[in-house]
Swiss-Prot record:
The record marks S364 as: Required for activity. It is a peripheral membrane protein. Belongs to the ATPase alpha/beta chains family. The gene is atpA. It comes from Trichormus variabilis (strain ATCC 29413 / PCC 7937) (Anabaena variabilis). The keyword Calcium does not apply. This is ATP synthase subunit alpha. Gene3D superfamilies: 2.40.30.20, ATP synthase alpha/beta chain, C-terminal domain, P-loop containing nucleotide triphosphate hydrolases. GO terms for molecular function: ADP binding; ATP binding; proton-transporting ATP synthase activity, rotational mechanism. ATP binds at G171, D172, R173, Q174, T175, G176, K177, T178. Its main location: membrane. GO terms for cellular component: plasma membrane-derived thylakoid membrane; proton-transporting ATP synthase complex.
Amino acid sequence: MSISIRPDEISSIIQQQIEQYDQEVKVANVGTVLQVGDGIARIYGLEKAMAGELLEFEDGTVGIAQNLEEDNVGAVLMGEGREIQEGSTVTATGRIAQIGVGEALIGRVVDALGRAIDGKGDIKASESRLIESPAPGIIARRSVHEPMQTGITAIDSMIPIGRGQRELIIGDRQTGKTAIAIDTIINQKGEDVVCVYVAIGQKASTVANVVQTLQEKGAMDYTVVVAAGASEPATLQFLAPYTGATIAEYFMYKGKATLVIYDDLSKQAQAYRQMSLLLRRPPGREAYPGDVFYIHSRLLERAAKLSDELGKGSMTALPIIETQAGDVSAYIPTNVISITDGQIFLSSDLFNAGIRPAVNPGISVSRVGSAAQTKAMKKVAGKIKLELAQFDDLQAFAQFASDLDKATQDQLARGQRLRELLKQSQNQPLSVAEQVAILYAGINGYLDDIPVDKVTTFTKGLRDYLKSGVNPYFQDVQSKKTLGDDEEKALKAALDDYKKTFKATA
């Protein structure tokens, strides 16, 4: 008996099988490791890799595609990568580096990828943001007009900083750069400002000290610490500042004021130089790659004061740069000076002479901050920079001149007292009312008959006297931030009263 198969039956069976076929075809962009070492991997394949794309290695290590060359891809590793070998498989993820952000980050210490490193458990992020985000455009911004008080009299009076400004802190090692940044964070208590402190390439013990100081002062309640220590791969040290900016950006677009400190960008540039040289990119001046300016400009341009339509948020950036023997004309210092809206220059000579904070008012400048200075401070601080500059000139001249006229002697005496009252202890920021009172006393001659070595005692006593509430001045200036006729009259009365008691007890 012959079996006859009809063609239409065959076609219907095939059609049925085709319709039931549901196996998914997975297309993956895969490559093979050609060479690995020093935190760099060269990979064959990955034809469709994007610049900056995250790559996943066999052992779970993540890398970033940096060099897209004709026959291979150069990638930097974001981990030790000890298990990666020649011939290992690499898969392109199709994603760009991003981190989790949200309120849960406040009070925590995280690494450059936003992972908790403080032993307090995982962080439940509310959303993800790209580490490399575009900076706000021209229309999205408005000019800097609100003060960002550092609590340091020398800075708030002569080099004022506004919300949304980029102000560089520059100086040799051990001149108090980090101390100024930490004081500024401590001074934001009660101001509804979210602070982000980014430690790049620092010793773990140094970062632990900073966190401890912030905890003791109650500042970790509004601060996030991003740490990429000296033992971390260069890739993470390079990424850490962008992570800090991304965390601050989340709060900025929610309408909050934020403050980011990058401590310090010299080490970030060195990490980028290391990555670039190992990737065989051509070196330029001081062996830095040609785009080292761009890594800092795209970071610092993300700091802004947003327009009213975007919620009035702000990101103030205080980048720190370390100089070698006071040389501000080196490559990285000049780059960052040209990007920022001013610089606070700390001098090792002043520091060693006991003038702390060691701010050099001669070459320090704030290009936009004066528009943000409080009215009370503007009224008293106008003359101080000029007086100190003239004092420096006279002091140099007085070393050679034996007989000085009375006016010159008086000006020298006034200058010495002004310099003395600008001295301030670490981790003790002052309120606006305290700063205004001290400066007013110095400029209007209340200290002229006080011995130079007693000026610090006088100013401390004056601050305590004003805060005791005997006089209405302190509360009025603290709330209004102006120094009107009534406040000035109250301040004069307070100064006269306190000076009498000080002279009687001295």
